[in-house]
Structures are given as structure tokens and as C-alpha cells.
Amino acid sequence: MPYIELESLDDVRLDVFARLTEAQLRNKLEPEKGIFIVESEKVIDRALLGGVQPLSMLMTPEWVDRTREIVARAEAACEEPGGLPVFVVPSKEAERLTGFAVTRGILLACRRPQLPSMEDLLARVDAEKAARAAAVAAGELDPGEVGNMHDASRRRIAVLEGIVDHTNVGAIFRSAAAMGIDAVLVTPTCCDPL
């Protein structure tokens, strides 16, 4: 899909990036219609690797050439009729639209992934631990690179309750990954991790 240059911020297609509240994006009543916003090429890359469903993209002109590869990947992952709309707005307008400088150049609106059941999550954790253990046993993986291998029969799960600051939730997720935590559960009293 070609890039769509916009001069007016009144375009309703930009609502998802600026005029919808977190609660409206999250859409608790109809979670399958929920949306979350991903910022930066690096985070978009990780989200696409995780299988998210892209809906639309917003960037400023100076990022168009630098992000062609990630835009192509997002377009390839988009299942929306008509493809992935990629909106380009002047930097000052992007700042006015979002309320902050789009310092990482690119925003991607994505469909919220369906959360696994507790049983499915634990089965996935167990399968990943077993696969890592088998790879170490076969000499395909260095034990030092595996992380939480000290006891494959135990699961290490972090539970976040009542964390209301997005920065803290992000820091906890990064720390959990660094410590080899197998899964992170977030209660409804936490702010949205996405």
C-alpha cells in the first residue's frame, strides 16, 4: 500500500493514535476488538515476530526511508482488507496529534492478541523448558545461554498486582526476562502492559 500523506489531523483514521483513551483501545467489553500501540522500529520488529496483527502505521517524513524494511514486514503481516495504511504526517503535527515527540519515528496500531488460558500458558512454559533441556542435552545449545535451567520441573512465574505505572510494568517485564522468569501474569488491577 502506498504511503498516505496527511496534512489534516482531523482524519478519523488517526483516532487510534491520538483520540482514543487507553480504556477505549483496550476494549474490555469486546477484547477481540481491542487495539494497542507499538512505538519504535525495534519494538515493532519484536511484536511482528510475536505474531501481532498490524492495523495501521503512523510516521513522520524523516522516517520513511529508514523504515521501509519494517513497513514491508508489517504490510506482509497485515490481514486487513486493502492492506496496511501507512500515514505520514509532519513532525510538528505528529507531536500535536500524539501529545509527545515521536522520537522513535514510527507507531504501529495492532489488534490485541488473544490471551491464552492458564492451562495453555503453563503447557507452553513446560514445552519451552523441555525443548531447551533437550537442546542442551543434544549439545545444540550452550547451558549458559539457556537461563532458567536449574530445575526444569519448576516454573518461575511473576504475578503483578496493582502496578499502576506503565514505566514500572515495563521495567518489571524487562527484569523478568533478564532473570529467566517463565511467565508474567498481570491482574486486572494493573495498568495495561501493552
What is the predicted function of each stretch?
Residues 66-70, 191-194:
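Short, glycine/polar-rich helix-capping loops at beta-to-alpha or helix-loop-helix junctions
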